[in-house]
């Protein structure tokens, strides 16, 4: 298999060729991936917000953002600047420390989770053997921040929103993890790189979405609930709870919740693309592309082309899913809290357990097709 271009090795080699020591070159490299990750996640959020505004406008037969840049593309930037310059108000009876750490606990795990998202064979920050386990573990931290924010606000609407958020997250975290375990069982690995490689070789027919149709539906429903997207936005239902746990927040603290929600949506779409849609894999095999271009598979320019195509394919798959999530928000009504919990505990949980057991049985019966 073509191993692709190793960005870390190439970057360090370039600096050492300029006369820098190996230790200094590695020290310069270390903060770069995290910086690029934060920049990429922020840009992804800006694109997502712009898509949300334009798609919602199209659904409602409006124009949407139009004046802030061409087609209103700078409107999310203007919204962000507005929030930056707003006054940061802390309610008089709120707990100031918990009020501060609530949004931080919500946002930080989501950004750290981008560590395990691969955009190519070597295009990820770190290839952990337990990457999927790390993502599930980090996603379980956010409800603590939501509950903390609701409790610290000393507001009945905020507290109810925080309690709803915690209940919703716990209810859907388990089916989400069980659906991912079925993929892990087929791939024999918790590494996101190995999961994508397990889907390679057969083009679109090798994607896990065909071998895990039930699992992919469970994952998608649970991911929407984890992101608190309609029809699962019970923690911040405007008609019932004003803004839920966000009611007392303003300025940058509110912006952290806002950014965290969209960063989590983009992350969920990227993880879905990696687990079920082949990640960076595209229909044309690398050896066929090399034959058409008349170059070797190890040619540096071919590696750059395949890396660019891998990034493009991963992002396109993710934003297709985001498009579906946005359409669902503006076309599906909100469920009640009892319906939400019944769906998670009485339907998704048993179905995900049966799906996991069925995957284990199929793995034993058909090891070639199910990763034996």
Curated annotation (Swiss-Prot):
Keywords tagged on the record: Membrane, NAD, NADP, Plastoquinone, Quinone, Thylakoid, Translocase, Transmembrane, Transmembrane helix
Membrane topology term: Multi-pass membrane protein
Primary site of residence: membrane
Transmembrane segments annotated in the record for this chain: 27-47, 97-117, 130-150, 176-196, 204-224, 254-274, 308-328, 351-371
Reaction equation(s) it catalyzes: a plastoquinone + NADH + (n+1) H(+)(in) = a plastoquinol + NAD(+) + n H(+)(out); a plastoquinone + NADPH + (n+1) H(+)(in) = a plastoquinol + NADP(+) + n H(+)(out)
GO molecular function: NADH dehydrogenase activity; oxidoreductase activity, acting on NAD(P)H, quinone or similar compound as acceptor; quinone binding
Cell compartments where the protein resides: Cellular thylakoid membrane
EC number of this enzyme: 7.1.1.-
GO BP annotations, alphabetical order: aerobic respiration; photosynthesis, light reaction
Disulfide pairings: none
GO CC annotations, alphabetized: plasma membrane-derived thylakoid membrane
Keyword Cell wall biogenesis/degradation: no
Keyword Transmembrane helix attached: yes
Family, per entry: Belongs to the complex I subunit 1 family.
Functional summary from the UniProt entry: NDH-1 shuttles electrons from an unknown electron donor, via FMN and iron-sulfur (Fe-S) centers, to quinones in the respiratory and/or the photosynthetic chain. The immediate electron acceptor for the enzyme in this species is believed to be plastoquinone. Couples the redox reaction to proton translocation, and thus conserves the redox energy in a proton gradient.
Subunit structure: NDH-1 is composed of at least 11 different subunits.
Annotated protein name in UniProt: NAD(P)H-quinone oxidoreductase subunit 1
Species this protein is from: Microcystis aeruginosa (strain NIES-843 / IAM M-2473)
């Amino acid at each position: 298999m073509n191993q692709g271009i190793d960005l870390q090795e190439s970057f360090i080699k370039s600096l050492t060729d300029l006369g820098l020591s190996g230790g200094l070159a590695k020290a310069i490299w270390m903060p770069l991936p995290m910086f690029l990750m934060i920049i990429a996640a922020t840009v992804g959020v800006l694109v997502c917000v712009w898509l949300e505004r334009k798609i919602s406008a199209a659904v409602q037969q409006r124009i949407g953002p139009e004046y802030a840049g061409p087609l209103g593309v700078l409107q999310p930037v203007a919204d962000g600047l507005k929030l930056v310059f707003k006054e940061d108000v802390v309610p008089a009876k709120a707990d100031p420390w918990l009020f501060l750490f609530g949004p931080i606990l919500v946002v930080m795990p989501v950004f750290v989770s981008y560590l395990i998202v691969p955009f190519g064979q070597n295009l990820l920050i770190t290839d952990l053997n337990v990457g999927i386990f790390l993502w599930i573990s980090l996603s379980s931290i956010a409800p603590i921040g939501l509950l903390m924010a609701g409790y610290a606000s000393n507001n009945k609407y905020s507290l109810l929103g925080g309690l709803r958020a915690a209940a919703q997250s716990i209810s859907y975290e388990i089916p989400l993890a069980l659906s991912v375990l079925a993929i892990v069982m087929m791939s024999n690995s918790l590494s996101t790189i190995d999961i994508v490689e397990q889907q390679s070789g057969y083009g679109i027919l090798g994607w896990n979405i065909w071998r895990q149709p039930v699992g992919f539906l469970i994952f998608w429903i649970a991911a929407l609930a984890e992101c608190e997207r309609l029809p699962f936005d019970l923690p911040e239902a405007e008609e019932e709870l004003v803004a839920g746990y966000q009611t007392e927040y303003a300025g940058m603290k509110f912006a952290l919740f806002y950014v965290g929600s969209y960063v989590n949506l983009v992350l969920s779409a990227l993880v879905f693309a990696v687990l079920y849609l082949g990640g960076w894999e595209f229909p044309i095999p690398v050896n066929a592309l090399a034959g058409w271009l008349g170059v070797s598979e190890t040619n540096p320019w071919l590696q750059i082309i395949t890396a660019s195509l891998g990034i493009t394919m991963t992002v396109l798959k993710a934003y297709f899913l985001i498009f579906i999530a946005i359409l669902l928000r503006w076309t599906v009504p909100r469920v009640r809290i009892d319906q939400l919990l019944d769906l998670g505990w009485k339907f998704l949980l048993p179905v995900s357990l049966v799906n996991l057991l069925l995957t284990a049985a199929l793995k034993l019966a058909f090891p070639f097709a199910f990763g034996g």
